[in-house]
Each structure stands twice: as structure tokens, then as C-alpha cells.
């Protein structure tokens, strides 16, 4: 619930900046064991990248999927034409991948045909 609040607050901020956010979600009823400060760092980086690189004329997609053993959060956006020329070291995304990996999860980010996808999978606490 707390993780969802972090994401939704940032999405609200993006909507206030004029972004069209498209959400899709399974019914989420799970618990995660996560360092909330590190998770804030991960999502802070993702939203910073969205604000810098996303095409404001096309929707940003966010989906939440609950599986038997993990929670999957995906962010998708088209890259703005002027953003394609901006330099990036990719260190932020590498740090995100390490943090999520240290939590026992997986992190993917990549671009294909101008569309950028970030996929985070975090293990659930099974009671």
C-alpha cells in the first residue's frame, strides 16, 4: 500500500505537469519486504527520467500486476524527439537495478522504436 502511494503521488505530480497517465491494475492485495527509502530512490529516478525524456504528447502507461510470488510494476513511454539527443550515463538505472536486485527482485529497462519500458518485479511475502 505504501509503495503504491509513492508511485501514485508521483503520477499525480506528472498529471499536474500536463502528462496523460494511463493506468491498469490487477486487484493488488499483497505485502512486500522492502527498504522504503531505497524504493523511494528507485521510483524517484524513474519519475525523474519520465519528466526529462517522455513525450508529453503521448500517454505514459503504468501497470500493476500481482502474481503468486511477485508484484510487477511497468512504466512505458514514448521518448520525446528532443530528448533523444540528451546525454545520459545510465548510472541511475544501473543503481535502480542493483537496489531492486538486492531486494530479490528484477529490473529491466530498454528502448525499442522510440518506446521506453521499465519493468520492476518484487517478491511477495508469502504467509
Model-inferred region functions:
Residues 13-23:
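Short conserved segments within the C-terminal catalytic ATPase subdomain
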Residues 39-43:
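A residue-level detector for a conserved hydrophobic packing site
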Residues 50-51:
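Short helix-loop "hinge" at the ATP-lid/N-box region of the Bergerat-fold HATPase_c
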Residues 72-90:
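Glycine-rich/acidic phosphate-handling loop/turn and adjacent ATP-lid/helix
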Residues 57-69:
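Short beta-strand/loop element within the Bergerat-fold HATPase_c
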Residues 31-34:
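Conserved micro-motifs of the catalytic ATP-binding
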Amino acid at each position: 500500500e505504501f509503495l503504491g502511494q509513492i508511485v501514485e503521488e508521483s503520477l499525480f505530480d506528472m498529471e499536474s505537469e500536463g502528462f496523460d497517465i494511463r493506468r491498469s491494475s490487477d486487484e493488488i492485495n499483497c505485502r512486500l519486504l522492502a527498504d522504503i527509502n531505497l524504493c523511494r530512490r528507485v521510483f524517484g529516478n524513474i519519475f525523474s527520467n519520465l519528466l526529462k525524456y517522455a513525450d508529453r504528447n503521448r500517454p505514459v502507461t503504468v501497470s500493476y500486476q500481482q502474481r503468486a510470488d511477485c508484484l510487477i510494476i511497468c512504466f512505458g513511454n514514448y521518448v520525446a524527439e528532443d530528448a533523444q539527443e540528451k546525454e545520459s550515463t545510465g548510472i541511475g538505472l544501473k543503481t535502480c537495478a542493483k537496489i531492486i536486485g538486492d531486494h530479490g527482485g528484477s529490473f529491466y529497462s530498454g528502448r525499442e522504436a522510440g518506446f521506453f519500458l521499465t519493468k520492476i518485479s518484487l517478491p511477495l511475502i508469502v504467509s
